[in-house]
């Protein structure tokens, strides 16, 4: 290996921990269940806040250039050096009849994941729903801090008869992403009302940016991380999207779907230390399926190729839930 760099990718989970590989002796088969006929997701965005330039997809995998044997996890950025090839969630288990239910990807030779939330009771989706959510919702912490400062300055002006907002923010325009933040699912279709995390400024339970609500970075530091399991937005720059495994027939694994809704985040920090060479990923898993899974394994498939792909080593620190 001719090139070495302190490289670190952290996969954070809100509802599970990575560990054992997904294994089963059952042979996958093409499921007879109804599918929504969703098209494969196509959105690709680069996460390049710090010293890493990483290709992020809505389709369930990371880094690999679509339909090519090349990757885009470049570190240092603009060096032409690709340190990792691809990665994806592997989720699987058996139902009460010992039938395998599995959602997984390797190199996108097929598709097991689609975009959009599922209905809460029946774990269903539609072609239109999948298409609507085929995007990354990109925010930065600086953007949210500026919006909050602008809004609170306006409140102070109303209370005190001042004009601080116009003086300090003369040309400010509320970013479109704050206005169109996907805080709520479509309850008329049976989706969860609460979708993407948001800060509810007036506590009315409804997202409205004109009331001071914003995509929820914990900028007010009122989240007790040691006891609060609710998921906020992380990082200095954050890409949020939502996926499911019920949008169509599983052509990557050939297995029956689970009915899993996955709320994903890819994020990074800008810093002057090792974190500047890192990217982070968070997956919140919600089982919308009607059946309990047994013998269940959640894992994260990673094909790393640091320099020469034939002399790489992997390891883990079990006590810290860390793979490297």
Language-model regions, residue ranges each:
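Bacterial Sec-dependent N-terminal signal peptides
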Residues: 1-23
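A long-range scaffold signal marking pre-active-site subdomains of enzyme folds
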Residues: 20-324
């Amino acid at each position: 290996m001719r090139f070495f760099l302190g490289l670190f990718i952290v996969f954070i989970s809100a509802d599970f921990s990575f560990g054992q590989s997904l294994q089963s002796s059952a042979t996958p088969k093409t499921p007879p269940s109804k599918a929504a006929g969703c098209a494969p997701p196509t959105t690709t965005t680069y996460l390049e806040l710090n010293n890493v330039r990483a290709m992020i997809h809505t389709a369930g995998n990371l880094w690999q250039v679509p339909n090519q044997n090349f990757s885009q996890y470049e570190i240092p950025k603009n060096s032409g050096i690709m340190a990792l090839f691809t990665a994806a969630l592997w989720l699987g288990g058996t139902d009460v009849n010992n039938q395998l239910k599995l959602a997984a990807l390797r190199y996108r030779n097929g598709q097991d994941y689609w975009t959009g939330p599922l209905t809460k009771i029946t774990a269903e989706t539609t072609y239109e729903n999948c298409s609507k959510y085929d995007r990354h919702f990109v925010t930065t912490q600086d953007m949210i801090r500026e919006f909050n400062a602008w809004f609170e300055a306006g409140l102070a002006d109303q209370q005190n008869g001042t004009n601080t907002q116009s003086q300090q923010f003369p040309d400010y325009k509320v970013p479109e992403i704050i206005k169109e933040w996907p805080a709520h699912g479509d309850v008329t279709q049976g989706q969860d009302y609460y979708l993407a995390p948001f800060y509810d400024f007036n506590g009315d339970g409804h997202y409205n940016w004109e009331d001071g609500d914003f995509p929820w970075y914990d900028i007010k530091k009122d989240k007790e991380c040691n006891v609060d399991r609710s998921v906020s937005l992380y990082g200095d720059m954050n890409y949020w999207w939502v996926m499911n495994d019920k949008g169509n027939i599983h052509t990557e694994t050939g297995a029956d779907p689970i009915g899993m809704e996955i709320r994903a985040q890819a994020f990074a920090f800008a810093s002057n230390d090792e974190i500047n060479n890192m990217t982070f990923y968070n997956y919140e898993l919600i089982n919308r399926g009607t059946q309990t899974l047994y013998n269940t394994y959640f894992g994260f498939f990673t094909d790393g190729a640091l320099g020469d792909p034939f002399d790489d080593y992997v390891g883990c620190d079990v006590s810290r839930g860390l793979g490297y």
